[in-house]
From Swiss-Prot:
Protein's name according to its UniProt entry: Aquaporin-1
Family: Belongs to the MIP/aquaporin (TC 1.A.8) family.
Classification of source organism: Eukaryota, Fungi, Dikarya, Ascomycota, Saccharomycotina
Encoding gene, per UniProt annotation: AQY1
Record's keyword annotation contains Endoplasmic reticulum: yes
SUPFAM superfamilies in the record: Aquaporin-like
Function: Water channel required to facilitate the transport of water across membranes. Involved in sporulation, freeze tolerance and osmotolerance. Is non-functional in most laboratory strains.
Region (Disordered): 1-34
Alphabetized Pfam families for the sequence: MIP (PF00230)
Domain of life: Eukaryota
PANTHER family: AQUAPORIN TRANSPORTER (PTHR19139), MIP17260P (PTHR19139:SF199)
Species the sequence originates in: Saccharomyces cerevisiae (strain Lalvin EC1118 / Prise de mousse)
Motif NPA 2, chain ranges: 230-232
Length: 327
């Protein structure tokens, strides 16, 4: 082998293996399919504290606003006509209060801790490996403490009874309430997984569909269960009202089962690798649009290339018209 060939081989080997040892070479990592929003950094004590502070502030802000709005709605005179809290005006006001409160709270604290603000959502994120189990426990503690703090603050700042605690209504049984809470939470958690965890161009807008999903859940469930879908919300309100019904467990088991159900649906989509289908559909659509744009350009190119001929013909016709017109 010549010296030049030897040098080329050494250079190629250096490019592929900077260490010069084949066994120690580590290939580049594959790109992540999950969004980095919830992975603020490694699980150090400092970073756990940052996540805990972000979840506490975000959950407190979300639930305090929602509790106060809910209290105002339930103190309305319409409560006399609809003692179960099923008056449409109350339902819409409560749903808007919770939906918009979680929306702006997520937008504020998504860059700090991810903005889960809900133990059920945190469980879905942990199952999806968007956060570690340790981080999930830290978030749970912060969210539950923030829920109790928000309930106490809302109760202390507003006069009258505490009317934002969860309870069954319209003759809803515990079993029905459990399944309603489970499916309502599943819708919320699946929205989080599909809009915030999946890597998309619209991740920065994830707070909007999450808020809308919580709004829809409240419109659907409030008359029947009071809409928990968040154990921190249910516990904080129960502590503030000093009201723990014998069926309080459905506001914990239901949301946790819902978060597992949402993760199961999301995991099934990952196994089916739905992104390849979506990518193929987008590629086909882009190709079709490109072909449609090219077709109108063909007559234009013909006119441009034959402009001189067309000009000569039109000039001849014009002269003939003028000559015959004079005759």
């Amino acid at each position: 082998m010549s010296s030049n060939d030897s040098n080329d081989t050494d250079k190629q080997h250096t490019r592929l293996d900077p260490t010069g040892v084949d066994d120690a070479y580590i290939p580049p990592e594959q790109p992540e399919t999950k969004h980095h929003r919830f992975k603020i950094s490694k699980d150090t004590l400092r970073n756990h504290f940052i996540a805990a502070a972000g979840e506490f502030c975000g959950t407190f802000m979300f639930l305090w606003c929602a509790y106060v709005i809910c209290n105002v709605a339930n103190h309305d005179v319409a409560l006399v006509a609809a003692p179960d809290g099923s008056h449409p005006g109350q339902l819409i006001m409560i749903a808007i209060g919770f939906g918009f409160s979680v929306m702006f709270s997520i937008w504020c604290f998504a860059g700090v801790s991810g903005g889960a603000l809900n133990p059920a959502v945190s469980l879905s994120l942990c199952l999806a490996r968007a956060v570690s189990p340790t981080r999930c426990v830290v978030m749970w503690v912060s969210q539950i403490v923030a829920g109790m703090a928000a309930g106490g603050a809302a109760s202390a700042m507003t006069p009258g009874e505490v009317l934002f605690a969860n309870s069954l209504g319209l003759g809803c049984s515990r079993t029905r309430g459990l399944f309603l809470e489970m499916f309502g939470t599943a819708i919320l958690c699946l929205t989080v997984l599909m809009t915030a965890v999946e890597k998309r161009e619209t991740n920065f807008m994830a707070a909007l569909p999450i808020g809308i999903s919580l709004f829809i859940a409240h419109v659907a469930l409030t008359a029947y269960t009071g809409t928990g879908v968040n154990p921190a919300r249910s516990l904080g309100a129960a502590v503030a009202a000093r009201y723990f019904p014998h069926y309080h467990w459905i506001y914990w088991i239901g949301p946790l089962l819902g978060s597992i159900l949402a993760w199961s649906v999301w995991q099934l989509l990952q196994i089916l690798d739905y992104t390849t289908y979506v990518t193929a559909e987008k590629a086909a659509s882009t190709k079709e649009k490109a072909q449609k744009k090219v077709k109108p350009a063909v007559p234009l190119l013909w006119l441009k290339s034959n402009f001189s001929l067309l000009f000569f013909i039109s000039r001849s016709l014009a002269l003939n018209v003028i000559i015959f017109g004079k005759n």
